[in-house]
Amino acid sequence: MKKLLFSLLLATPLGAWAQQAIPLTDLSAFDQPSKNWTIEQAVFATYSDTLFQVSPGSGVLVNTLRGGKYHRTDDLKSKMQHGDIRLLVDFMLPKGMNSGIYMQGRYEVQLYDSWGKKTVKYDDCGGIYERWDDARGKGNEGYEGYAPRQNASKAPGLWQTLEIDFQAPRFDTNGKKIANAIFKKVILNGLVVQENIEVSGMTRGAIFDQEAPFGPILIQGDHGPVAFRNLRFETYEKPTASLGEVSYDYYTGKFTDPIVPATKPVSSGKLPALTYRVIPVNNDYLMHYKAELTIPEDDTYEFQTYWTGSGELKIDGKVLNQGAHWFNEMVPASTFLKAGKHQLEIIHIKDFPWGPKALGLNVKRIGSRLVSLHERTSLLDPDAVGLIEVKANAEPVLQRSFAFHLGKKKTHVIHVGDPSGLHYSYDLKQGAILQVWRGKFLDATQMWDNRGEPQTSEPLGLTVVQDGKFPLALAHQAQADSTDLVYKGYRLEAGRPVFMYEWTAAKLRVEDRIQPSGNGLKRTLTLVGTSPQKTDVEAVLATGHHLSILQNGLASQPGNFIEWEGATAELLKIASGAQQIRVPFSGAQFTFDLIW
């Protein structure tokens, strides 16, 4: 349980971050944009289009060629200057296109149509572009480029997400660089593709000759069409809280509540920072820490406490955090504080012999990075748990487990891995695809490590969540669900499962085949048997929001395309503002592809 909890905490950003948006109602946030840049309401492209279709309005930043050819002056520069920053943006590329985002106008994260590439390099999507020096000699000019850890690119024409956590280079008072720029993290479509990458200087194509503490966001605009939306950021330039010398009183005995006893402490002393390491025993003690907390500016500050046992955090006598916790449980509490000096107190007790001693305190305000107020060794690192990977290298692999889908734990799930690198999770109870992904197969650590308490497993590649619903309905009727279905098992064809169901409402048997098709997964639904309702069956291709029919035989939903042949689809409005794409069956079989 403790390991699971810690992994969940790691997956959650520490502390809230305030997203400032770059408004995309006009181009006023940018410095002298070329005529190629416009603001539109929406852009559309199929996975084979090299150009966008646009609809007028606002909300999407679009670069399209409006002259004879592209020029370097088509790069787009923000008026905003930044140092340390966390940037989040959605982007879309047509087929074969190329762009990039330069932090401070100097350090490029590559945007490229890398869809389907088996091996990726520094110039693929999510890569940190190489540096360049002509003096190194012909063929050796490029150096220090960093490939993404894996190919996390979606198909062209789909919206993709990019998050960049960037630490600017540091300079002394004389302007001499004393620390390099660092890409602390780059996350492409939910996958970490770069982490703690230090760049010794500017990458190729920078618009400045020298490094500096600040610079603009630069979007490469001279390599082809590209679109952006939801441009958000947080800069980390504000000062944060600091802690002065720490005094402590140490008591021994059985303590059940964090109340300082009236008796004389066993020992007292002073420390440069918070730490448990002055406690000579493992249990049956109470520590009372006091320190002066300096607040630089009026603001709301979040304090995050960690301890093994019970404790209480007070500021100016007001209790912020209290309770019994394990050392890897982060407990946050926020309070507004005026600039100046404040009194901070922590009372910590541990009345049981098992488990390690630990004590930690972090502070965060909007506009500054998280800062630890404890000694580094006072908060233990978690036990390292090796990845337990299920591979599907030589033949299809079927693996049962529980799985989370849209926040709910599903218990009748089978994961199907394929040597092609195209995999999916399937809800046997519902007859539904829960998620599809590309890359490595399955992380079974939470199922097989130690006691395997959660019994869940997770995809290891670029994942697109599906609606998790049975893909058939009778005309003008609600979509079938598990109450209408009787699962009859599966049989294997070339090692891949064919799932079988009795569909009671339609008095038909349904066979569901899902196979890799190069671009994605091909799903074939077959109706078996005779029934008067057989001619009324419709395939439900997607249910959700932001669905679009791009052309006859091709639709999109957030995360993937849906492609089929034959009948014309209908886009329906259903309950709660959702949409549904339906296509009538023609005969006893219907096939469609999921492409991402």
Language model feature labels by segment:
Residues 73-79, 148-154, 217-218, 276-281, ...:
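Beta-strand-rich interaction surfaces with strong enrichment in secreted/lumenal proteins
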Residues 1-20:
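Bacterial Sec-dependent N-terminal signal peptides
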Residues 19-262, 268-271, 281-290, 294, ...:
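Carbohydrate-interacting regions of secretory-pathway proteins
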Residues 20, 79, 372-511, 517-520, ...:
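Beta-strand-rich N-terminal accessory domains
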Residues 301, 528-547:
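Surface-exposed beta-strand/loop patches in extracellular or lumenal glycoproteins
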Residues 197, 237-387:
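Acidic/polar, compositionally biased interaction segments
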Residues 199-207, 274, 313-333, 548-583:
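Solvent-exposed beta-strand/loop surfaces of large extracellular or lumenal domains
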Residues 87, 91, 512, 521-529:
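Short, well-ordered beta-strand segments enriched in hydrophobic/aromatic residues
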